[in-house]
A protein has these predicted regions:
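Non-heme Fe(II)-dependent double-stranded beta-helix
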Residues: 2-26, 31-131
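Catalytic core of non-heme Fe(II) oxygenases with the double-stranded beta-helix
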Residues: 117-183, 222-232
Length: 268
């Protein structure tokens, strides 16, 4: 993806090195205006269409109080707009600053919190809790794009600053501080360490949705949450060759060969 003017502006205001320091210290960072107004509106319209389609087809994945919240998985298959988010130049640069040059996209999903909740939706968790503790180093990074303003009232993501340094899931040991909400304007990109304790927040508003697109990236030797080899639309690999490595279709060092041999991509 060509870096947009909005992304270039964001880099000029907060260099990747400064973002990296913020991530190392607090476990999270907010980058305002990562999406410009046109990009934001395009993604919003595409997501709203998908939500309506899933509802009409009876396949909407709803959760939380009264089913007010909705999740959509495998967003790469749902539109070019979401491929562009997964390959967002600034987002990938920040991810690689922590995980190294070779990364995989573990999942890409939409998460919408609906109004009227009366309790927190998500349980505090990390995104590398499937690995033995204590963790030797960071193995995952999350990138979220705010499609609406994320506020104290409408379900902004909860995080525990500094909790990535505990090297354990939230159930093990005492959190270093109380949870806070990642608030920001629509178009903001939030990035957080996969070890950071976080959760979906409670939407206390009577009539507001909180829409976001969430990507998780991992080191290349880990298994992805979404099995792209089974679910990815193969035509996307022709249109977006960069997805081949990002979705685990390429070898990495001695892993992922075919019949013991290395090859570029897979033929279907």
């Amino acid at each position: 993806m060509t870096m947009t003017n909005a992304a270039i502006s964001a880099v000029s205001e907060m260099a990747i090195e400064e973002i990296r320091r913020k991530l190392d210290d607090d476990g999270y960072c907010l980058v305002p205006d990562a999406l410009d107004a046109k990009e934001l509106e395009t993604v919003r319209l595409a997501l709203d269409r998908i939500l309506e389609e899933d509802d009409a087809a009876g396949v909407a994945l709803r959760y939380g109080p009264d089913g007010a919240n909705q999740r959509v998985w495998a967003m790469l298959n749902r539109g070019e707009e979401f491929v562009r988010l997964a390959t967002h130049a600034l987002g990938l640069a920040i991810v690689r600053s922590g995980l190294g040059p070779d990364i995989q996209l573990s999942n890409l999903s939409a998460n919408v919190t609906g109004p009227g909740g009366n309790r927190e939706i998500g349980r505090l968790h990390t995104d590398q809790g499937f690995l033995p503790e204590p963790w030797p180093y960071q193995l995952a990074t999350n990138v979220a794009f705010f499609l609406d303003d994320f506020t104290e009232e409408n379900g902004a993501t909860l995080v525990v600053p500094g909790s990535h340094r505990t090297l354990t899931v939230p159930d093990h040991g005492l959190a270093p501080s109380a949870p806070m909400r990642l608030t920001g304007k629509a178009g903001t990109m939030a990035v957080w360490d996969g070890r950071l304790h976080h959760a979906t927040g409670l939407n206390r508003t009577p009539d507001q949705r909180r829409r976001g697109i969430f990507a998780t990236y991992i080191r290349p030797f880990l298994r992805t949450q979404e099995n792209w080899c089974r679910s990815l639309d193969r035509h996307l690999l022709d249109r977006h060759p960069e997805l081949s490595a990002l979705c685990g279709f390429e070898e990495w060092q001695t892993l992922g060969g075919v019949n013991g041999a290395r090859q570029s991509g897979l033929n279907f």
